[in-house]
UniProtKB/Swiss-Prot annotation:
GO terms for biological process: dosage compensation by inactivation of X chromosome; myeloid cell differentiation; negative regulation of DNA-templated transcription; negative regulation of epithelial to mesenchymal transition; negative regulation of type I interferon production; neurogenesis; oogenesis; positive regulation of DNA-templated transcription. This is Histone acetyltransferase KAT8. SMART domains: CHROMO. Changing residue 274 to R: Abolished ability to acetylate proteins. The gene is Kat8.
C-alpha cells in the first residue's frame, strides 16, 4: 500500500469543522468594537543599541498578529526551525481560541521599550474612543451567538468542574502545534491544532502529503519523488455517489486501515476536541472529492461508527480549509442524513461539536425545517418532522427554539409558526438554500445486510 505503515491515532469524536460561511481563523476573532482594531500600529524602529528583553517560556508579551494588530500572547515553547534556519516562539493569544496559536519570529514580539510604548499609546487611544460610544446592552442569547461566531474561548470558571478538568488535561497534551503547515495537492495550508504524527514527523514545521494516498513526508524532495511513483488517483473503497464533478467514496476502516489513519492525522490538524483511538476498524469513512482529468481530489469527509449505541450518524466531519465556504460542509451533513433515511433511522452528530460545526449544523437544520414548514399544510408534530428528515427530536426542538418557533405548553413542546415568520427566516442569508445539494437519484448505496435485518424486525 502506498501510505505509511506507522501506527497512527484515529479521531472518533465529532469536532466538526464543516465551514459554511463561518469566519476563518483570525477573522472576527476579537470582541465587537470599532472598525479599527485595538493595538493596530506600524512597529516603530527601536533606537540604535536599545536593549531587548529576553524571551522566556511562560511569560506574556505583546505580539503582532498577521492582521497587524497587537495582542497579549503567552510564549508556550521555542524551537529552531531547521527548514527556515531561524528561532521561533509558539504563542497563545490570551482570550482567543487555540486555533489562532502560532509560531512567530522574534521580530513580532514587542521586546523593546520603544515598540511597547507605541503599542500602549495606540491601545489607550482605542479605549478612549470605545468609552465615548453609547452603551449597548446585549441579551444572553445575543452573547451566546456572538461567542460562537467570534470563537470566544470559555474560561475554566465558566465550565462545570468535570469539563474544566478534562479541558485542562486536553490542553496540556495538545498545547504545542509543532506541525505549522502542510502542503497537499495545489495547496499550502496553515494547521490549526496539534496532531499526533508519529516520531520525527510530529516535530516538523511543515509536512508534505500526497492528496491521493495521504502518505505524509518530511521533505519536499521525497514528496516530489513520491508523486512520480504513486499510482493512486482516487480514494480507496467504493464510489457511491457521482454527480457532475462531485464524487463520494465509502471507505471501510477495516479494509483500508493505513489510509484511514492518515486521514485522521490530517483531520486532527483542523479539529480540536477529539477522543483518539488507534483502531479505525469500527468506522466507515465517506470521502468527498472534486473530480477532474488528474483524479479525485479530497475536499472533506465524515466518518461514522458501524454500530453506534448512541444513534450517532456522524463521528467526525471536516471540510479542508481551501474548500470551505463553498457549500461542501452542508453537503456532507445532508449526505449523512440521506444515509440515515435509507437506514430508516434518526441520527445526530457525536458531541462535542466545534464552534464552526455548531454553526453549520444549526444552519442546515434550520433550512431543512423551514423548507418543510413553508410548504406543509395541516397538522405537523415534532415526531413527524423527525421521521421526515431523520433529524432527532432533540435537535429539532433546539433548532426551532433558536428560531422562536416552539413553545412549551401543558407539558409538551408545541410548534408555533406563521407563514410570515417562516418567509422572514428563509430570506436571511443564514438559512438560504445550500449551493450544493445531494441528489438522491445519484446515490448508489444500501445499508449493510445486518442492518437491513434489524430494520425489518422493527
Amino acid at each position: 500500500m502506498a501510505a505509511q505503515g506507522a501506527t497512527a491515532a484515529v479521531a472518533a469524536t465529532t469536532s466538526g469543522t464543516v465551514g459554511e460561511g463561518e469566519p476563518g481563523p483570525g477573522e472576527n476573532a476579537a470582541v465587537e468594537g470599532p472598525a479599527r482594531s485595538p493595538g493596530r500600529v506600524s512597529p516603530p524602529t527601536p533606537a540604535r543599541g536599545e536593549p531587548e528583553v529576553t524571551v522566556e517560556i511562560g511569560e506574556t508579551y505583546l505580539c503582532r498578529r498577521p492582521d497587524s494588530t497587537w495582542h497579549s500572547a503567552e510564549v508556550i515553547q521555542s524551537r529552531v526551525n531547521d527548514q527556515e534556519g531561524r528561532e521561533e516562539f509558539y504563542v497563545h493569544y490570551v482570550g482567543f481560541n487555540r486555533r489562532l496559536d502560532e509560531w512567530v519570529d522574534k521580530n513580532r514580539l514587542a521586546l523593546t521599550k520603544t515598540v511597547k510604548d507605541a503599542v500602549q499609546k495606540n491601545s489607550e487611544k482605542y479605549l478612549s474612543e470605545l468609552a465615548e460610544q453609547p452603551e449597548r446592552k446585549i441579551t444572553r442569547n445575543q452573547k451566546r451567538k456572538h461567542d460562537e461566531i467570534n470563537h470566544v474561548q470559555k474560561t475554566y470558571a465558566e465550565m462545570d468542574p468535570t469539563t474544566a478538568a478534562l479541558e485542562k488535561e486536553h490542553e496540556a497534551i495538545t498545547k504545542v502545534k509543532y506541525v505549522d503547515k502542510i502542503h497537499i495537492g495545489n495547496y499550502e495550508i496553515d494547521a490549526w491544532y496539534f496532531s499526533p504524527f508519529p516520531e520525527d514527523y510530529g516535530k516538523q514545521p511543515k509536512l508534505w502529503l500526497c492528496e491521493y494516498c495521504l502518505k505524509y513526508m518530511k521533505f519536499e524532495k521525497s514528496y516530489r519523488f513520491h508523486l512520480g511513483q504513486c499510482q493512486w488517483r482516487q480514494p480507496p473503497g467504493k464510489e457511491i455517489y457521482r454527480k457532475s464533478n462531485i464524487s463520494v467514496y465509502e471507505v471501510d476502516g477495516k479494509d483500508h486501515k493505513i489510509y484511514c489513519q492518515n486521514l485522521c492525522l490530517l483531520a486532527k490538524l483542523f479539529l480540536d476536541h477529539k477522543t483518539l483511538y488507534f483502531d479505525v476498524e469500527p468506522f466507515v469513512f465517506y470521502i468527498l472529492t472534486e473530480v477532474d482529468r488528474q483524479g479525485a481530489h479530497i475536499v472533506g469527509y465524515f466518518s461514522k461508527e458501524k454500530e453506534s449505541p448512541d444513534g450517532n450518524n456522524v463521528a467526525c466531519i471536516l471540510t479542508l480549509p481551501p474548500y470551505q465556504r463553498r457549500g461542501y460542509g452542508k453537503f456532507l451533513i445532508a449526505f449523512s442524513y440521506e444515509l440515515s433515511k435509507l437506514e430508516s433511522t434518526v441520527g445526530s452528530p457525536e458531541k462535542p461539536l466545534s464552534d464552526l460545526g455548531k454553526l453549520s449544523y444549526r444552519s442546515y437544520w434550520s433550512w431543512v425545517l423551514l423548507e418543510i414548514l413553508r410548504d406543509f399544510r395541516g397538522t405537523l408534530s415534532i415526531k413527524d418532522l423527525s421521521q421526515m428528515t431523520s433529524i432527532t427530536q432533540n435537535d429539532i426542538i433546539s433548532t426551532l427554539q433558536s428560531l422562536n418557533m416552539v413553545k412549551y405548553w401543558k407539558g409538551q413542546h408545541v410548534i408555533c409558526v406563521t407563514p410570515k415568520l417562516v418567509e422572514e427566516h428563509l430570506k436571511s442569508a443564514q438559512y438560504k438554500k445550500p449551493p450544493i445539494t445531494v441528489d438522491s437519484v445519484c446515490l448508489k448505496w444500501a445499508p449493510p445486510k445486518h442492518k437491513q435485518v434489524k430494520l425489518s424486525k422493527k
